[in-house]
């Protein structure tokens, strides 16, 4: 099993920069997780680095995961596993078979893609894992989107990077916004804040007033909040009852636009605006949709003069899918 030196050395903090465009009556900053130097970057690369450690430790010879044809997670896991020199098997819903850039990359990395109806995903995963074991293989399964404690831990580190930037730059963010899909990113950010606030209280300092807002790209609020809360509980373990504050979990489904992958002309306009003003590519499924939702949320809640950080969670290949659709 080959090493990936970036993951062996550890991922360096990603840059935070003030945005140039006029996006409303607040000061907007962006954390460029898309600049992590592996497979087009993104928070999925940060999560993959955590799964990499477990895979190396367990002597795995095949990695399984789940995701759609547009999945950034599947692209990065397929790339990571190819770099390690072991097999990758992806379960994907047959309902989404348009050949996107992420689809092509997954194929180029040599992953086997097995499709099934979305209603049969769970059973297909179980059967395939058992088939690998019966064949004498040592499979390792990663939940869709990098869901689970390794992924949450990766995003706790994201929060710590943000806190370190605030201290170094002499700035305090009032809000953090990001795209919320499987919920792991938000679980990590909120867990990081809860742990940091507990340390401050122990030192007699006030907790941070920062609000973390997950902009749902698919799930309704009830389901989305519960998945994030459960991930926080799983990660904090015995400290959950002591640390968790329900008001810290802000999840909005007001900008889902009908579900996963759905978007409006206003989202497309936002993506074009950000590219022209700041030179930053976004996409219609995750980041561009969430950035648009952030601006609408800020206007609806009367936010003015605030320091707002948006986390660019990656997905550059999807930007080129967007360009192709715009040129049809």
Region annotations inferred by a language model:
Residues 1-328:
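PLP-dependent amino-acid enzyme catalytic core
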């Amino acid at each position: 099993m080959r090493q990936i030196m970036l993951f062996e050395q550890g991922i360096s903090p990603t840059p935070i920069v003030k945005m140039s465009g006029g996006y409303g009556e607040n000061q907007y900053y962006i954390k460029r997780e898309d600049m992590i130097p592996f497979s087009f970057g993104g928070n999925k690369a940060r999560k993959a680095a955590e799964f990499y450690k477990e895979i190396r430790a367990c002597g795995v010879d095949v990695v399984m995961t789940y995701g759609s044809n547009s999945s950034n997670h599947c692209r990065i896991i397929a790339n990571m596993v190819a770099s390690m020199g072991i097999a990758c098997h992806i379960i994907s819903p047959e309902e989404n078979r348009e050949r996107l850039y992420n689809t092509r990359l997954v194929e180029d990395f040599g992953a086997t893609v097995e499709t099934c109806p979305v209603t049969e995903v769970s059973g297909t995963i179980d059967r395939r894992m058992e088939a690998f074991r019966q064949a004498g293989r040592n499979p390792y399964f990663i939940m869709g989107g990098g869901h689970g404690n390794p992924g949450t831990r990766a995003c706790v580190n994201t929060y710590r990077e943000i806190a370190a930037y605030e201290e170094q730059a002499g700035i305090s963010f009032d809000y953090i916004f990001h795209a919320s899909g499987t919920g792991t990113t938000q679980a990590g950010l909120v867990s990081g804040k809860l742990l940091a606030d507990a340390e401050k209280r122990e030192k007699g300092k006030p907790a941070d007033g920062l609000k973390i807002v997950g902009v749902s790209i698919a799930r309704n609020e009830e389901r989305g909040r519960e998945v994030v809360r459960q991930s926080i509980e799983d990660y904090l373990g015995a400290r959950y009852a002591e640390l968790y504050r329900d008001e810290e979990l802000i999840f909005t489904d007001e900008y889902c636009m009908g579900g996963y992958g759905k978007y409006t002309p206003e989202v497309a306009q936002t993506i074009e605006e950000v590219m022209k003003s700041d030179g930053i590519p976004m996409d219609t499924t995750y980041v561009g949709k969430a950035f648009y939702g952030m601006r609408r949320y800020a206007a609806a809640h009367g936010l003015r003069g605030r320091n707002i950080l948006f986390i660019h969670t990656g997905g550059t290949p999807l930007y080129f899918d967007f360009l192709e659709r715009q040129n049809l």
